[in-house]
């Protein structure tokens, strides 16, 4: 039961197909407060060197980004020329900004035509990407962005496409395909086709079939870009079938997906000792925001309730709640209204909350990939962070060993005291 829960939460996909429903126009969401952040200064050359539109540079400055990350430095110059791109780079290094900036740079808005299609495997990630487009197109008032996903009435999406057709569409494959099949969404003018966390969509056969059908509805001549933090050697040939002579960028070798600045520890304990240990650690550790990962919806609800009873400012996100509630809670956490988030794997991939500096694996993830995506919620954008994993049985210990072997990282037992400066920025 718990395993199925985890799988469904991670993919969040079958709901797209069964509930004939979807998300609204991105413009209806509450305005997003600007959150300052800065990528690690790997390259002294700034974004200006990419010769981006002045409107884009202005938005980049507003976001507080000064220097491109390594993946941006490698990808953006080619991506803005319309080249196909296949990119793997570790979590938290700004892959989303690569395709957002590259497509906005090339976009020439035509009324009533969708030019850019971005797809990802969960609704929350789709919502977040649409917000990034809004953030970076702040000084491009003619650009319209919409997001479509399962969970709300399809009629609302059809109205948006009919009355206020966007130039950029972000969504999940199930809903995008439904809108394309009923002729509400016209894909004949697509110039840029993007898959974010592409491995998750192409590994699942039902989702891959949907992506392929959507792909065939778009023009032959277009730019295709695919991104992920984990891209196995088996899935790369599948990605290439969608592309023409792509530029391939693997910023890190598969075995070296370590996160610089992230301290990783484990705690050995019994399952019934987890709550007490968690409360003790939350009392002594310094944190901006914390994400606590659990394995099922039931545990998510119970732990969040327990934390609130212990006067910790916690909020829960899981697939058992209505779509509007999930997005509302995500936005509350992002806006710093709550400092502790309890979540299932649903929140594990690609979600950007820049203030998170501690991630807890209250329950051990089911594999090393999921471990990477979970702990990468802390220490994003090259900042410092702390990941603590609870190990309560032999299976947990085995997975932890797999993580250490695969990523060539040494995860040691949590010491009695940790130097605060090792996991929190002192000048935030």
UniProtKB/Swiss-Prot annotation:
Note the superkingdom of the native organism: Eukaryota
EC number per UniProt:
3.6.4.13
Motif extent (DECD box): 196-199
Q: Where in the cell is it found?
A: Nucleus; Nucleus speckle
Q: Where is this motif: Q motif?
A: 45-73
Q: Which GO terms describe its biological process?
A: mRNA export from nucleus; mRNA splicing, via spliceosome
- Pfam families in alphabetical order: DEAD, Helicase_C
Question: What is the annotated role of this protein in its UniProt record?
Answer: Involved in nuclear export of spliced and unspliced mRNA. Component of the TREX complex which is thought to couple mRNA transcription, processing and nuclear export, and specifically associates with spliced mRNA and not with unspliced pre-mRNA. The TREX complex is recruited to spliced mRNAs by a transcription-independent mechanism, binds to mRNA upstream of the exon-junction complex (EJC) and is recruited in a splicing- and cap-dependent manner to a region near the 5' end of the mRNA where it functions in mRNA export to the cytoplasm via the TAP/NXF1 pathway. Splice factor that is required for the first ATP-dependent step in spliceosome assembly and for the interaction of U2 snRNP with the branchpoint. Has both RNA-stimulated ATP binding/hydrolysis activity and ATP-dependent RNA unwinding activity. Even with the stimulation of RNA, the ATPase activity is weak. Can only hydrolyze ATP but not other NTPs. The RNA stimulation of ATPase activity does not have a strong preference for the sequence and length of the RNA. However, ssRNA stimulates the ATPase activity much more strongly than dsRNA.
Domains: entry comment: The helicase C-terminal domain mediates interaction with ALYREF/THOC4.
The UniProt similarity line reads: Belongs to the DEAD box helicase family. DECD subfamily.
Q: What is this protein called?
A: Spliceosome RNA helicase DDX39B
Q: Which organism is it from?
A: Gallus gallus
């Amino acid at each position: 039961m718990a395993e199925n829960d985890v799988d469904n939460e991670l993919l969040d996909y079958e709901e797209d197909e069964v509930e004939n429903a979807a998300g609204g126009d991105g413009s209806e969401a509450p305005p997003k407060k600007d959150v300052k952040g800065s990528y690690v200064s790997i390259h002294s050359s700034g974004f200006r060197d990419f010769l981006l539109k002045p409107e884009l540079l202005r938005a980049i400055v507003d976001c507080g980004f000064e220097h491109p990350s390594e993946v941006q430095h490698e990808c953006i110059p080619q991506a803005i020329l319309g080249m196909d791109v296949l990119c793997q780079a570790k979590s938290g290094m700004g892959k989303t900004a690569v395709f957002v900036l590259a497509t906005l740079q090339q976009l020439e808005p035509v009324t009533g035509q969708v030019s850019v299609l971005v797809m990802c495997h969960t609704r929350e990630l789709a919502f977040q990407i649409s917000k990034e487009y809004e953030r970076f197109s702040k000084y491009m008032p003619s650009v319209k962005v919409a997001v479509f996903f399962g969970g709300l009435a399809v009629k609302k999406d059809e109205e948006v496409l009919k009355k206020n057709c966007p130039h950029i569409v972000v969504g999940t494959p199930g809903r995008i395909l439904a809108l394309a099949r009923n002729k509400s969404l016209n894909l004949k003018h697509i110039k840029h086709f993007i898959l974010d966390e592409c491995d998750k969509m192409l590994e699942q056969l039902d989702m891959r079939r949907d992506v392929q059908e959507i792909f065939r509805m778009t023009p032959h001549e277009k730019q295709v870009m695919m991104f992920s933090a984990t891209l196995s050697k088996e899935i790369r040939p599948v990605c290439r079938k969608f592309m023409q002579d792509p530029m391939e960028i693997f910023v890190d070798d598969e075995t070296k997906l370590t996160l610089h600045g992230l301290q990783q520890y484990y705690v050995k304990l019994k399952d019934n000792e987890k709550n007490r240990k968690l409360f003790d650690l939350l009392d002594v550790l310094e944190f901006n925001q914390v994400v606590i990962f659990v394995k099922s919806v039931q545990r998510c609800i119970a732990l969040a309730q327990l934390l609130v009873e212990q006067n910790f400012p916690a909020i829960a996100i899981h697939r058992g709640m209505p779509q509007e509630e999930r997005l509302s809670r995500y936005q509350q956490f992002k806006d710093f209204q709550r400092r502790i988030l309890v979540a299932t794997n649903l929140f594990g991939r690609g979600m950007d909350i820049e203030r998170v500096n501690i991630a807890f694996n209250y329950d051990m993830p089911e594999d090393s990939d999921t471990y990477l995506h979970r702990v990468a919620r802390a220490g994003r954008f090259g900042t410092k962070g702390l990941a603590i994993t609870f190990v309560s049985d032999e299976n947990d210990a085995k997975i932890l060993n797999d993580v250490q072997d695969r990523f060539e990282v040494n995860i040691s037992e949590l010491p009695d005291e940790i130097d605060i400066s090792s996991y929190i920025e002192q000048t935030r």
